[in-house]
């Protein structure tokens, strides 16, 4: 009995001399189609892949955009529609609802789930898509007058970006408002290394009464996958593509750069998170990077500046010296 207590005492004393420290678990952020939300001074990232708990979406958090920590699983397949193909999540805090909304794709259908915290767990009260037609890549925009719009991809002529007004419940659209926004038309949007009519990954911003639709084009496996934008005086278009597109393509030695989203930073500036190919010879796994995003006084959007390569931290214990 005394030996048992002595062993326990020695174990406790050894633990007192230990402490945890942050260590680099991954030297990259393991998500594609990434999205970042700033909430109460902390950044939260979501994307395709990166989960360690089965189908669904992971959540990562950061104070500085460089070092990230894995949070709990944000959404699990058991709590939502679909069993495969969980892609392109975007999370919004809707003040009028006091809820977080996660818009995403599953089984090539667009869905939405809700939670009380940015980490989740996000769940669907009724496990069903927003509408029956196959679609992907949702992005929510709520205008100054409170009208909600949903932008997403339909397979009408390749991948084509459409918009529709949402009902106030934010779980369904008004089909009669469906409007085509962006399709492949420009030479840069149809790269010959992997020709495919793909316009996808929409994001919407508004500045000085002008609406900006940021999108990606080309097949995601193409080395020339890139980002462009179009402008309009209305959230439903018509949209005029910027003559200087693409504004992001083959940057900083990276290939396949695109399908990201602009987000506001703590200091009020903007940045753009996007994914790229693993390296110059392999597409998968795609990983995420961050660059600056701005709209000039002349209304020109740009993605530039120094690049941030995020890393994921874990913890390890060490003995005090």
Residue ranges with predicted function:
Residues 1-4:
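Positively charged n-region of N-terminal signal peptides that target proteins for export
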Residues 18-321:
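Carbohydrate-active catalytic/glycan-binding domains of CAZyme proteins
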Residues 10-17:
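Hydrophobic h-region of N-terminal signal peptides that target proteins for export
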């Amino acid at each position: 009995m005394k030996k048992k207590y002595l062993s326990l005492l020695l174990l406790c004393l050894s633990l007192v001399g230990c402490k945890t420290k942050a260590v680099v678990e991954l030297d990259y952020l393991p998500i594609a189609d990434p999205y970042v939300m700033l909430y109460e001074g902390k950044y939260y990232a979501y994307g395709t892949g990166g989960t360690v708990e089965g189908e669904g979406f992971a959540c990562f958090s950061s104070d500085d955009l460089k070092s990230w920590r894995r949070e709990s699983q944000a959404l699990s397949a058991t709590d939502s529609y679909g069993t495969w193909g969980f892609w392109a999540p975007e999370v919004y805090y809707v003040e009028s609802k006091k809820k977080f909304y996660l818009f995403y794709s599953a089984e090539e259908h667009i869905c939405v789930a809700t939670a009380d915290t940015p980490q989740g767990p996000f769940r669907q009260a009724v496990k069903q898509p927003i509408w029956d037609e196959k679609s992907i890549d949702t992005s929510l925009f709520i205008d100054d007058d409170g009208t909600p719009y949903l932008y997403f991809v339909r397979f009408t002529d390749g991948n084509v970006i459409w918009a529709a007004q949402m009902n106030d419940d934010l779980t369904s659209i008004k089909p009669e408002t469906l409007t085509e926004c962006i399709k492949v038309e420009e030479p840069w949007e149809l790269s010959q290394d992997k020709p495919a009519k793909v316009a996808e990954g929409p994001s919407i911003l508004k500045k000085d009464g002008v609406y900006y639709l940021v999108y990606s084009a080309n097949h995601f496996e193409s080395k020339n996958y890139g980002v462009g934008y179009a402008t309009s005086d209305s959230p439903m278009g018509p949209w005029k593509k910027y003559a200087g597109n693409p504004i992001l393509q083959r940057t900083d030695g990276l290939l396949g750069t695109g399908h990201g989203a602009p987000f506001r930073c703590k200091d009020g500036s903007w940045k753009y998170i996007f994914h790229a190919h693993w390296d110059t010879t392999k597409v998968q796994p795609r990983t995420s990077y961050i660059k600056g995003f701005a709209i000039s006084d002349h209304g020109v959007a740009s993605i530039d500046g120094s690049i941030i390569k995020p890393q994921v931290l874990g913890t390890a214990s060490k003995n005090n010296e």
